[in-house]
Amino acid sequence: MSKAVRMEETKASIGKIISLQKMVDPRGNLSIAEGMKDIPFNISRVYWTYDVPSGACRGGHAHKHCREFIIAVSGSFTVTLDNGLNKQVFLLNHPYQGLLVEIDIWRTLDDFSSGAVCLVLAEDSF
């Protein structure tokens, strides 16, 4: 069984953690993700999941023509990536970091904390 890894320590061959711009302000912090600048593709679609029931899983598929960048904008969850040869589990729990998922990588999201929000920036509108 794979174990979740801290994002600061991760250099994965299946997925890649990317730190986003972070502006710290006493009034509240701000992070930015720009296509072709912070992430390596143009963003065609943005979607998010929320109110995920305890024990539920999301994803459970791969995309043949679409890379995705997954961010835990609130709370935490795990993402399991599988390329058919290797599996790796990532704990996403910082709104200023995200996980780049390449084409043809199977992804499953689970272990959502209460109130977790998963934001996905997708390369294609599929």
Where are the regions that the model predicts?
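Well-ordered alpha/beta subsegment
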Residues: 94-99, 104-111
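Non-catalytic, conserved peripheral segments adjacent to functional cores
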Residues: 2-97, 114-115, 121-122, 126
